[in-house]
Amino acid sequence: MDSDMDYERPNVETIKCVVVGDNAVGKTRLICARACNATLTQYQLLATHVPTVWAIDQYRVCQEVLERSRDVVDDVSVSLRLWDTFGDHHKDRRFAYGRSDVVVLCFSIANPNSLHHVKTMWYPEIKHFCPRAPVILVGCQLDLRYADLEAVNRARRPLARPIKPNEILPPEKGREVAKELGIPYYETSVVAQFGIKDVFDNAIRAALISRRHLQFWKSHLRNVQRPLLQAPFLPPKPPPPIIVVPDPPSSSEECPAHLLEDPLCADVILVLQERVRIFAHKIYLSTSSSKFYDLFLMDLSEGELGGPSEPGGTHPEDHQGHSDQHHHHHHHHHGRDFLLRAASFDVCESVDEAGGSGPAGLRASTSDGILRGNGTGYLPGRGRVLSSWSRAFVSIQEEMAEDPLTYKSRLMVVVKMDSSIQPGPFRAVLKYLYTGELDENERDLMHIAHIAELLEVFDLRMMVANILNNEAFMNQEITKAFHVRRTNRVKECLAKGTFSDVTFILDDGTISAHKPLLISSCDWMAAMFGGPFVESSTREVVFPYTSKSCMRAVLEYLYTGMFTSSPDLDDMKLIILANRLCLPHLVALTEQYTVTGLMEATQMMVDIDGDVLVFLELAQFHCAYQLADWCLHHICTNYNNVCRKFPRDMKAMSPENQEYFEKHRWPPVWYLKEEDHYQRARKEREKEDYLHLKRQPKRRWLFWNSPSSPSSSAASSSSPSSSSAVV
């Protein structure tokens, strides 16, 4: 009913617009975007094309479509009626062409054949059925000109013909055909919501101008303009690539545990029951146990062990005056709580004392973790007797021992353990000291608790108590706390060089490190120190082209799994070193740190173009591909500025990079050409309009008076006898 009223309204011009073109060029999508305000999702864009026609009766059954058909163009109220058609060449479209006011002829910029059919098939057909109707040429699917065609083709159905880059038509191709046919040319994208209003507003203008020639008495058509020029579409600026840091290397606990089974670079021999020898590593034992830390810092050549306040050294966490005493006091309180929770059991020191060959008896512990200060005796050479210093140890001394893997003699520390310590439970304790974990299925939990008490490893006592109380799930938090504490202790040992067994000679100095930690965290280091190389048997390793700041960052990463920056750190040199050591996770962390710094500098209005040019080829050569992609993006999106400031450097780029710049530069070349053409055409249009306005006579005669016109009233007053008005 409302649709009939549109035809009856005297000042509403009803425009019939027929949309034609090949199949799958986007005719129906374009109509739906105008009539229904429909948008196209990525899924719909890539879906298999199904031939459809938008029904004209939507104007009768849908009030929203009818409301959207009404518009005002150049002060003229119009009602636009869109007619969709099939694109098959054999279809009979004479009914659709009947009484059409304007024809919109569509082709796809990704299908050259559809543009060829514009001249050979569609335009002749239009002129045959409606020779007086104006025609508008429209290039659809503009978004494919800047889309990632590889991703588009992957997402399409398997048998669909892929879109090739050389098939994408530049704007001048469509403009040439339009100029040859003498019709306006526009481009649209339903995905980008560009050009839809331009197409139909100018189609309305073309129809109204054609109608004005026949219905010259309609004064409201006097100010209708000819179809306007379309400003070129600037593709959206591509977002910078996101630096993705992969998950850190797994099996962080497996590698230290493997060092117990395969004691590479071992420097400690633990002797149990005079016959069992277990090889271990100072750095792992001392960073997991305060007792072992004090033990390995003892002076074995001079002086006498005084008491609990002079154990020969203090733990890395106990180095700050009064906080040292507070730490021991706090530690004892926690030890008492752990002992109470685990029932404070202990194993008799010998089977004979417990009553022959029966099982080991349990008795309440009397040490409670307090160091005894009765002094120690001395062994011949470098060594000490420790039985009065701790119940866990008998003696410690340095001696030449055969390496279990290389079979070469070298100096090691030999520690004889108390006879009550059994090999099986002690290995479980060592596994905890290396990994922070305790197997719930361990059978000798009592003996493990006994050893943990002797070594004052109260967290392990707590874990045993949790298992006995069926609360093993609580051990996960203890393990996490273990790793946090050991990470802090390892960092202090790295800073002070405590227990180091290798020194790296660098360009600007030396830095001490620990082979066991390096072997368990880096395959490259494991191959160097564990293989048939000179570095495996020497305490000094030369690292050329490496600075202390870079090596310190690498060591902290290998020791703690975290990246730590410093003011004197060179990002690119660190990436080079990390790539040499086959550490892709550290490379990614450094890439992220570098990109963050560059983006912060950009926000502070600092020019980073020169740095990006330097980083680009270095990053590509040293496998920092994410940083290289970011540099490529920055250069492409600032291409003109970079070329203006660094012309020689840009010309010296590799052919691959130059090809990438030409393909992905923003704004693209086709846009710059279109912008230049648009500005020239706009100036020509303004000049034509000025000349046209200048040629028009200033006084025109009308058939009736126009009392509202000031010029007519002036003319009437000057010539009262005249029956006409001049405007």
From Swiss-Prot:
Region Rho-like, annotated ranges: 1-210
SMART domains attached to this UniProt entry: BTB (SM00225), RAB (SM00175), RAS (SM00173), RHO (SM00174)
Effect after changing N488D: In DEE64; also found in a patient with Rett syndrome-like phenotype
Tissues in which the UniProt entry reports expression: Ubiquitous, with highest levels in neural tissues. Expression is also detected in fetal lung, heart, and brain.
Outcome (variant: R485C): In DEE64; likely pathogenic; decreased proteasomal degradation; does not affect interaction with CUL3; no effect on interaction with MSI2
Coiled-coil annotated spans: none
Pfam name, any one: Ras
Keywords linked to the UniProt accession: Disease variant, Epilepsy, GTP-binding, Nucleotide-binding, Repeat, Ubl conjugation, Ubl conjugation pathway
Residue numbers binding GTP: 21-28, 84-88, 140-143
GO molecular function: GTP binding; GTPase activity; protein kinase binding
Transmembrane domains' residue ranges: none
Effect on the protein of changing R461H: In DEE64; pathogenic; reduced RHOBTB2 proteasomal degradation; does not affect interaction with CUL3; no effect on interaction with MSI2
UniProt similarity note: Belongs to the small GTPase superfamily. Rho family.
Protein's name according to its UniProt entry: Rho-related BTB domain-containing protein 2
Organism: Homo sapiens
